[in-house]
Design a protein with these regions (language model features):
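Active-site His/acidic residue clusters
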Residues: 72-77, 90-94, 101-104, 108-136
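Single conserved hydrophobic/aromatic residue that forms the stacking wall/gate
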Residues: 2-13
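Loop/turn elements at helix/coil->beta-strand transitions in domains of secreted/extracellular proteins
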Residues: 21-25, 47-50, 64-66, 99-106, ...
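Long, well-ordered, tryptophan-enriched scaffold segments
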Residues: 26-75
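Substrate-binding rim/cap in mid-to-C-terminal beta-strand-loop elements of soluble/periplasmic
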Residues: 180-207, 211
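Structural recognition of the beta-strand scaffold that forms the well-ordered cores
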Residues: 24-29, 67-70, 105-110, 115, ...
Length: 220
């Protein structure tokens, strides 16, 4: 997998990182953002990728490389009725990549709006985004269980908001919590791994060590 050098999808489009990358599947941003790019940029991307706005079995089957760019409504917050975009797209990516590779594949899935919701100190959105991300994790674990040779790693690059759980009532099903910050914090984040070589990811680790270990495993 090539590393795309920017977090901004618009910048990725402008530099034409996508056509020159080794990516087989991507889904990000929205089709509206794609349409705002210069015609020559759109043309170059479409030369390499089949671009779809909605899941299309016929187009997916015919494609050699796929870009799924849904409408803005599907990438909004779960509080804005996004639906099951993240878990369903995770399943789409797993199905697409596993059917086209005899030597395995690397897939990264990000629940980006967990961070955004924490920056806003929005309790409800954080909880709902985490539960939505958990469904994407479930899709990955189910595939790994069936495949038997897939490693799944779940973590975060940082904590946001310093969310503290203060008190709760099991009978009422309620929990009191408070945010201490609206920014990133040095609080440690969980690291979970399931599958072959998962023991490499136990204990307390520097996050840069996680990526180095992934690269070492991919090189084997």
């Amino acid at each position: 997998r090539d590393r795309l050098r920017s977090r901004g999808l618009g910048d990725v489009y402008k530099r034409q990182d996508l056509p020159n990358s080794k990516l087989t599947f991507f889904s990000a941003g929205s089709y509206e953002l794609f349409e705002k790019q210069a015609p020559n940029v759109q043309k170059e991307i479409k030369k390499e990728f089949t671009i779809i706005e909605e899941p299309n079995d016929k187009a997916i089957k015919k494609s050699k490389k796929l870009g799924y760019l849904p409408t803005k409504s599907k990438t909004a917050s779960v509080n804005e009725n996004r639906g099951d975009f993240l878990p369903s797209t995770t399943q789409m990516a797993i199905d697409y990549l596993s059917s086209r590779s005899t030597n395995g594949f690397f897939l990264m899935v990000e629940g980006a709006r967990i961070d955004k919701s924490a920056h806003s100190n929005d309790y409800s959105a954080v909880v709902r985004e985490v539960l939505d991300f958990d469904k994407a994790v479930e899709a990955a674990i189910r595939f790994a269980e069936k495949d038997g040779n897939t490693l799944v790693i779940i973590s975060a690059d940082h904590e946001t908001g310093a969310l503290a759980l203060r008190d709760g009532n099991i009978k009422e099903g309620k929990m009191k919590a408070m945010f201490v910050s609206k920014g990133h914090t040095p609080i440690m984040v969980p690291l979970f791994a399931y599958g072959p070589q998962s023991k490499l990811f136990g204990g307390v680790q520097e996050n840069s060590d996680v990526s180095n270990k992934i690269l070492q495993l991919l090189a084997k």
